[in-house]
Amino acid sequence: MKKFRWVALVVVVLACLLLWAQVFNMMCDQDVQFFSGICALNQFIPW
């Protein structure tokens, strides 16, 4: 049962990362000033 909990935790974390990546891409598309530096870094991270 403990193993299932770990799997669920990993799935939730991955889902959050994917959601975060999509929000990031939306912000970058809108060219938000605050995100401009982060967007430059974001290009190097293979989502």
From Swiss-Prot:
Membrane topology type: Single-pass membrane protein
InterPro entries from the UniProt entry: MgrB (IPR020907)
Major subcellular location class: membrane
Transmembrane residue ranges: 6-26
Keyword entries, A-Z: Cell inner membrane, Cell membrane, Membrane, Transmembrane, Transmembrane helix
Keyword Plastid in annotation: no
Pfam families (alphabetical): MgrB (PF13998)
Subcellular location: Cell inner membrane
PROSITE patterns registered for this protein in UniProt: PROKAR_LIPOPROTEIN
GO cellular component: plasma membrane
One of the protein's GO biological processes: negative regulation of phosphorelay signal transduction system
Described function: PhoP-regulated transcription is redox-sensitive, being activated when the periplasm becomes more reducing. MgrB acts between DsbA/DsbB and PhoP/PhoQ in this pathway. Represses PhoP/PhoQ signaling, possibly by binding to the periplasmic domain of PhoQ, altering its activity and that of downstream effector PhoP.
NCBIfam families: PRK10299.1 (NF007635)
Family: Belongs to the MgrB family.
Subunit structure: May form homooligomers. Probably interacts with the periplasmic domain of PhoQ.
Stated name of the protein: PhoP/PhoQ regulator MgrB
Organism: Escherichia coli O45:K1 (strain S88 / ExPEC)
Recorded name of the encoding gene: mgrB
